[in-house]
UniProtKB/Swiss-Prot annotation:
It comes from the Eukaryota. Its main location: membrane. SMART domains: IG, IGc2, IGv, LRR_TYP, LRRNT. This is Leucine-rich repeat-containing protein 4C. The keyword GTP-binding does not apply. Pfam families: I-set, LRR_1, LRR_8. Residues 354-442 form the Ig-like C2-type domain. It is a single-pass type I membrane protein. PANTHER family: ANTIGEN BSP, PUTATIVE-RELATED (PTHR24369), LEUCINE-RICH REPEAT-CONTAINING PROTEIN 4C (PTHR24369:SF8). InterPro entries: Ig-like_dom, Ig-like_dom_sf, Ig-like_fold, Ig_I-set, Ig_sub, Ig_sub2, Ig_V-set, Leu-rich_rpt. GO terms for biological process: modulation of chemical synaptic transmission; regulation of axonogenesis; synaptic membrane adhesion. May promote neurite outgrowth of developing thalamic neurons. The modification Phosphoserine is found at S631.
Amino acid sequence: MLNKMTLHPQQIMIGPRFNRALFDPLLVVLLALQLLVVAGLVRAQTCPSVCSCSNQFSKVICVRKNLREVPDGISTNTRLLNLHENQIQIIKVNSFKHLRHLEILQLSRNHIRTIEIGAFNGLANLNTLELFDNRLTTIPNGAFVYLSKLKELWLRNNPIESIPSYAFNRIPSLRRLDLGELKRLSYISEGAFEGLSNLRYLNLAMCNLREIPNLTPLIKLDELDLSGNHLSAIRPGSFQGLMHLQKLWMIQSQIQVIERNAFDNLQSLVEINLAHNNLTLLPHDLFTPLHHLERIHLHHNPWNCNCDILWLSWWIKDMAPSNTACCARCNTPPNLKGRYIGELDQNYFTCYAPVIVEPPADLNVTEGMAAELKCRASTSLTSVSWITPNGTVMTHGAYKVRIAVLSDGTLNFTNVTVQDTGMYTCMVSNSVGNTTASATLNVTAATTTPFSYFSTVTVETMEPSQDEARTTDNNVGPTPVVDWETTNVTTSLTPQSTRSTEKTFTIPVTDINSGIPGIDEVMKTTKIIIGCFVAITLMAAVMLVIFYKMRKQHHRQNHHAPTRTVEIINVDDEITGDTPMESHLPMPAIEHEHLNHYNSYKSPFNHTTTVNTINSIHSSVHEPLLIRMNSKDNVQETQI
């Protein structure tokens, strides 16, 4: 029994046999993976030695550490990285590639001159990028690629000299853009802000601007700061497209004049700050189109308090009746200096209604043409409106498809219709009252009758007598009186004398009323005729070329085959023993590999030899025939 129960050592291991050669590499791979995981966890939970970290390494502060480059060892969980006030000069490519959770990157107040393309790769969640107070001279547009969630960009106080077109089109998600204190800025392209359709805040303060740049692409802009510039005048159209703008700051911008209708595009404006400028007067009803305006700052301006400022006093009283001392004080005249504008009334002044120096004139036009009715007052501080024939009052900025009031008060028609016919009244207003002037617009329907290309002009001339001719040699000739009609046009020359000889000339001329369409029709007909002539000429040239080639080919065929009478002779019938072979033709060359070239027959030889030879040739060359020419010219051999 014991012998049966004794187990051999080889039988102790049950199952598959252990293979150490396979186990060792697998163990190495597992250990490597564990090390990588541990290293990743360690890196995710580490903090650079020169920085301070908080909130489970999500906030890394490296301020004023004299860093010359981005430090290593920043946690991948970092959401805010502050590198403020260091010595960094270059942001190299992939400097933040592993910080995929980073939302705020603060690089302000360094010495950054260059930002390489791809420097911000991997920052797909970046929300705010601060680059103010550095040494950038250009907008690093190429570095903004892939910042699809960037909302705020701060470039304040950099020596940037120009802003080219599409400078920010790589970051259409941008909401706030700070370009303030670009003191070396000398040029802003017309398309500089293209692509920023989602921008809500723009700072262009202290940028040495002498005029307002094109802001039309910023259709959602809410706040605009233009303070500290050199904007001597604000003109109509400066804020075109900014229908959603709510806050406008132009503090200390050296503004001297704000022209009529300058703010008409700002329909949503709530607050405007014009403090610390050089304003003395404002155009009548400047703020009237701003129905949502609630706060206005006009202090620290040298206001000249006269009749033209009364409307502003009344407007302030209506806007803030409980606080008329809120806004501005008079600087001149001396008797009103220091008095608040909101406290003035008409008793302080002797005022008059406005004067229209260029009233509109009656106008006759044809349907479809453009037209203008001008109306100019003695001063640009008045407001101008128009009353249409149906009683509608039109002001600058009022939406009409074909009719608009321009900034100078002109009523402009881009395409008149017959329905536009009627009387239009220009109304010029100031604080005292209104002055009106009217004009009639007469629109004639376009004629649809067929036009004649030519009409007859009858010219009647009267020759003066010799005495009168001598007295009028040194004088200017009589002024012709021209009367044009639709069908018959007559030009009359009226002399100074009644004694004359009348001569009548009939001259065909182009009808004035139908001249333009007649010329068009003639040009069309001329083009058609020229086109047909060119086509016929080309076809004739092609036919001549074809005819020439066919004739040349036919001539060659006739040259190689001259017309002659030939007689085909059967060799078996004509060749006899008595006939010498001198007059026989030589045999043609037989182009077969097994035959040699046949030479001319030699004479004389017997008939038997000749017959045998010919029979042998018949069997080889399929019975050739000899051609005998009737003439004594050279003979050709032909194989048939």
